[in-house]
Amino acid sequence: MLFNLLVILGPTASGKTRLGVELARRFFGEVLSADSRQVYRGMDIGTGKDLSEYGEVPYHLIDIVDPGYEFNVFEFQRRFEQAYNHITERGKLPVMVGGTGMYLESVLKGYRLVEVPENAQLRRQLAGFSHEALMERLGNANPRLHNSTDLLDHHRLVRAIEIAEYEAPPQAPFLPGLSPLIFGIQWDRPILRQRITERLKLRLDQGMIQEVERLHDTGIPFETLEFYGLEYRFIARHLKGELSRNDMFQKLNSAIHDFAKRQCTWFSRMERHGTVIHWLDGAADPLAEALGILSHQKTQSTPFCRP
C-alpha cells in the first residue's frame, strides 16, 4: 500500500501527540494538528498542546488565531490543504494528529467544504423561531458538520441551519490522490479514565486556572470562554463563584470522561462508514506496533502528493 499521509487519532489522554511526534521524527515528517482548540493562541494548558514534546519536529495549525476568532471546519480544511501542500512540496511526510472527529473527517472523506455566505432572507425567516423550533429544524436538515456547541447558543444555531440548508455549487475534489494510513490508540476504559483524571490534576498543578484568569484579564468574557471546551467552561464557572474548586474538579473530570466516550463513538462510526483504522494498544508499546505495520507499507515517492 502506498500512503502519503500518516494519521494518529484517539480519545483525549490516549497519547496521540507523543506517538505522532515520534513517527514524524523517524520519517522526516511534520505534524498537522487536527484539534479544534489548539488553533488558539494563549490556550495552552487547557487544550493540551504539549509543545515541549515536539522538539525539532515542525508543527502546523497550532497557535494560528487569537481567542475570539470564530475558527471552523471550513477554515481548518483550507489551512490544512495549504500546509499539506507546503510539506509535501519539500519532500516531507505529513502526519495528522488529533481527536476532533469533524476535522479528521473533513480531510479523510475527501469532500471539499465551502464557506457558506450569510443568508439574510433565511435569517429574517428564523428570527421569530423559538430555540426548540430551531433545534427541530436543524435536526430535520440532518447536518453532518456542526459543532455540539451550536445547540447551546441561538446565534450559532441559526448559523448551523444556514450551513445545513446551503446548496453549494460543484467543487473540485479535496486533495485528489490522498492516501492516508490511519493509526488509532486505544486503552481499556478503566485505564483511560485513570489517565484522564491524572492528567487533569497535572494540568491544574501546571496553572490551568491561572491560564483562564489571564485570558479573562485580556478582555475575553467568561461567557465566551465557556465555548472553548470543557476545561475553560468549568474553570470559568469556578472563577465566577458558581462552583467550588472541588466541585469544579469533579464535574470537569466527569465531563472529560463523557467526552472521551463520545470520541470513541465517533471513531467507531468512522469505521462503520469505511474508514480503516489500525488500532494500537496504548498500554503496550504503540510505537513498536506502529513501526511493525509501517515496515510493510510504502510511502509514495517524493513529493508524496502534488494535487
UniProtKB/Swiss-Prot annotation:
Catalytic activity from the UniProt record: adenosine(37) in tRNA + dimethylallyl diphosphate = N(6)-dimethylallyladenosine(37) in tRNA + diphosphate
UniProt KW keywords: ATP-binding, Magnesium, Nucleotide-binding, Transferase, tRNA processing
GO molecular function terms attached to this record: ATP binding; tRNA dimethylallyltransferase activity
Binding site for ATP: G10, P11, T12, A13, S14, G15, K16, T17
Pfam assignment, any one: IPPT
Region of interest (Interaction with substrate tRNA), ranges: 35-38
Site (Interaction with substrate tRNA): T100
Cofactor: Mg(2+)
Top EC category: transferase
Single biological process term from Gene Ontology: tRNA modification
Listed InterPro entries: Dimethylallyltransferase, IPT, P-loop_NTPase
Source domain of life: Bacteria
Residue sites binding substrate per the record: T12, A13, S14, G15, K16, T17
EC assignment: 2.5.1.75
Protein family: Belongs to the IPP transferase family.
HAMAP family per the UniProt record, alphabetical: IPP_trans
Known function: Catalyzes the transfer of a dimethylallyl group onto the adenine at position 37 in tRNAs that read codons beginning with uridine, leading to the formation of N6-(dimethylallyl)adenosine (i(6)A).
Assembly notes: Monomer.
Protein's UniProt name: tRNA dimethylallyltransferase 1
Species the sequence originates in: Geotalea daltonii (strain DSM 22248 / JCM 15807 / FRC-32)
